C-alpha cells in the first residue's frame, strides 16, 4: 500500500525542495541541555519527555521536563551500538538500536524495557528481508531505520531509505525474539530520508520528520503528515 501525505517544510541552506502543501507555525520551542547534544530519539507524554543519545554514548534514558531540564537519568544494562529512536506505552519503553547508515549490520535490535523495573529488558532481534551487509553501499541502501512509534498494539518501524527514497513501514511482532522484516506499506514522494515519526491523536495521522542533503554538506529538514489508512 502506498500512502498519501501532506508536506510541510522547514527549509535551510541551498537544498531544493518541492513547493510545500501547507505552512508550519512553531508555537513553543524547548532547548535541550548539553548532555543531550547527540540526542537521536524523543518521546513526549503529559508529564514530560524522554530522550536518549546516539551511538557510542552511555546507555541512559533521560527524563526531561518541558522547560528543557533533565529531571532523572535511568541507566540501562545495555550497550548503545546505534540508538536511533525511543517510544513508549504505559508499560514499556522501546529503544531502537537500529542505526545502519553504512549498511554493515546484518541484524539490528529493539529493546523492550519494563517501565516499573528497568532491569527487566527483552530484546527483539530484527533482520531485513533482502539485506546483504557485504554488498550494501554506505549511505546508498534501504536497510536503515531511525523512526519508530507504538500505536495501539502495533510497534511500527519506518525505514531511512537512502537508495530509493521510498519509505518502508514494518510491523514488529513483540512476541517474536528473532524475526525477518518485510514492509507491509510504503510512502512515496517524501523529499528526503525519514528520521522521526509520531502519531497525532487529535488529527488521527502520522507526523514524520526527516531531512534532505546534498554533496556539499547542505541540509534541509521537512515535516510531513501521513494518513493512517494503511493500518
Residue ranges of each PLM-predicted region?
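Sequence/structural signature of beta-propeller domains
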Residues: 15-231
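C-terminal motif of bacterial Sec signal peptides marking the signal peptidase cleavage site
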Residues: 11-12
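Sec-dependent signal peptide recognition
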Residues: 1-6
Amino acid at each position: 500500500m502506498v500512502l498519501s501525505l501532506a508536506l510541510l517544510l522547514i527549509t535551510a541552506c541551498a537544498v531544493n525542495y518541492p513547493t510545500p502543501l501547507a505552512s508550519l507555525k512553531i508555537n513553543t520551542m524547548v532547548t535541550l541541555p548539553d548532555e543531550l547534544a547527540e540526542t537521536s530519539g524523543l518521546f513526549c507524554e503529559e508529564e514530560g519527555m524522554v530522550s536518549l543519545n546516539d551511538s557510542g554514548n552511555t546507555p541512559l534514558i533521560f527524563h526531561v521536563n518541558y522547560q528543557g531540564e533533565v529531571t532523572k537519568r535511568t541507566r540501562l544494562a545495555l550497550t548503545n551500538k546505534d540508538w536511533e529512536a525511543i517510544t513508549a506505552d504505559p508499560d514499556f519503553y522501546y529503544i531502537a538500536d537500529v542505526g545502519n547508515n553504512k549498511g554493515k549490520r546484518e541484524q539490528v535490535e529493539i529493546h523492550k524495557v519494563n517501565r516499573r523495573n528497568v532491569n527487566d529488558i527483552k530484546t527483539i532481534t530484527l533482520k531485513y528481508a533482502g539485506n546483504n551487509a557485504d554488498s550494501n553501499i554506505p549511505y546508498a541502501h534501504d536497510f536503515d531505520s531511525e523512526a519508530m512509534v507504538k500505536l495501539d498494539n502495533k510497534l511500527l518501524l519506518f525505514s531511512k531509505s537512502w537508495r530509493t527514497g521510498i519509505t518502508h513501514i514494518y510491523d514488529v511482532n513483540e512476541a517474536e525474539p528473532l524475526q525477518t522484516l518485510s514492509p507491509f506499506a510504503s510512502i512515496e514522494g517524501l523529499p528526503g530520508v525519514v528520521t522521526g515519526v509520531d502519531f497525532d491523536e487529535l488529527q488521527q495521522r502520522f507526523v514524520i520528520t526527516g531531512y534532505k542533503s546534498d554533496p556539499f554538506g547542505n541540509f534541509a529538514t521537512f515535516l510531513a503528515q501521513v494518513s493512517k489508512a494503511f493500518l
